[in-house]
A protein has these predicted regions:
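Ligand-binding pockets and gating/stacking loops
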Residues: 1-395
Length: 395
């Protein structure tokens, strides 16, 4: 999920106006890294998110398909969380990582802007790779990482015990909120115990810690190792669902490691097509997508590989651009989830179909009966000209 918008001109091959195969097309420079993987790529335009109010960002609404805004809590769960519920149980149902400037990642190592488990229940993104490494692999580490992990674990366990013991005297109006607070500590302590039980297995997947963790020269050093941690969590089976927020769902972001001096809100005030700055950012994104695919391709699963059973969704929390009304919300799919989705093609969705339709289609692919995702019939009369799954993207 890249912030600042995803202009269609940065992903649609020149001259392509109607739905067709990508086989004989040349991908635009920003996504040229995906050229060898065209047969697994599906470029989609024509979906809309007008109802999400995505001008600076739809925030939780980008993955929830509802109106979102800065500082406004989620009004319902998001597609990534619902997927994590539908897929087989894992040690950590859902992992979110967020990439930003070094300063922002250090001062705010966790933020919640994109994912939610329900109304008023945001899911936080991890932005400090040192903290995330300790969480996932601290129990199998040595030296200072192990010491920090044990100290943190002891502290969290003690806080959890104290919190659980002290809540009984609170007024009824505060008990639910306090219960969620206590539940957070129980979740963290429970995860640590579950990870500890499979420590031998995890040793095969833990990334090597290097200077980029403790002494990053640029923010992209942390972006790269966060990606490594996310990939390792998929390969090891720690989680089945990974959400990556590049820009963390806000209007900020920095890529000085790519030679880009401009950062933050100004990046959204420029045209992306044929813009050297955005070519670099989108190429960096595309290289990350390639790395995910290649890593998952290396893991046997069933009669094929993990990538054969994976669907990667690439889009923006700003639809097509900053200050947009969300009338066109471009999406790229990579992989076909064992033949469920079409690939190797470009599709322009006709009519008035919201991003919710894509999300309900994805849920159906994992066995969840869902005609409309987070959209009432009353809302659908205004924002959806069809019903049911998005047939144009199904094989």
């Amino acid at each position: 999920m890249q912030n600042q918008g995803f202009e269609p001109g940065t992903c649609i091959p020149d001259g392509m106006r109607h739905s067709c195969s990508l086989a004989k097309a040349k991908l635009p420079e920003p996504i040229s890294a995906l050229e060898p993987f065209k047969d697994r790529l599906h470029i989609i335009t024509g979906l809309h998110g007008i109802h999400t109010s995505p001008s600076h960002s739809a925030f939780f609404g980008a993955l929830g398909g509802y109106r979102g805004s800065d500082g406004v809590p989620p009004s319902a769960s998001t597609i990534d969380y619902e997927l994590s519920k539908a897929l087989p149980d894992t040690l950590l149902p859902h992992l979110c990582i967020g990439m930003d400037s070094l300063e922002n990642m250090k001062t705010k190592p966790t933020v919640a802007n994109l994912s939610a488990s329900g109304a008023g229940q945001p899911i936080f993104m991890h932005s400090n790779p040192n903290h995330l490494y300790q969480t996932l692999y601290g129990g199998i580490s040595q030296g200072e990482i192990r010491k920090q992990h044990e100290a943190r674990s002891g502290m969290l366990e003690r806080i959890g015990q104290l919190a659980a013991a002290k809540g009984g005297t609170l007024p009824l109006s505060d008990k639910q909120r306090y219960g969620e607070f206590v539940g957070g500590f129980e979740d963290m302590n429970g995860l640590r115990e579950r990870l500890g039980k499979v420590s031998d297995h995890l040793r095969n997947f833990a990334p090597k810690v290097d200077a980029r963790y403790s002494s990053p020269e640029f923010e992209t050093d942390w972006h790269d190792v966060l990606l490594d941690l996310g990939i390792s969590s998929l390969k090891s089976g720690i989680t089945n669902v990974l959400t990556i927020g590049s820009g963390r769902g806000e209007i900020f972001g920095s890529w000085k490691g790519l030679g880009i001096e401009k950062q933050g809100h100004n990046l959204g005030h420029m045209t992306q097509k044929d813009n050297p700055i955005w070519i670099k950012i989108r190429q960096y994104n595309s290289q990350m997508l390639v790395k995910i695919m290649e890593e998952l391709e290396s893991v046997p699963e069933g009669s094929g590989t993990m990538m054969d059973n994976t669907l990667i969704v690439y889009t923006s929390n700003n639809a097509d651009k900053q200050h947009t009304n969300g009338a066109n919300w471009p999406v790229m799919l990579l992989g076909n989830c064992d033949g469920i989705f079409k690939s190797g093609c470009f599709t322009h969705v006709e009519g008035k179909r919201p991003i919710n339709t894509l999300y309900s289609t994805i849920l159906r692919s994992v066995g969840v009966s869902c005609d409309r995702f987070n959209m009432s019939e009353k809302m659908a009369k205004k924002f959806d000209s069809g019903s049911g799954p998005l047939k144009e993207i199904l094989a």
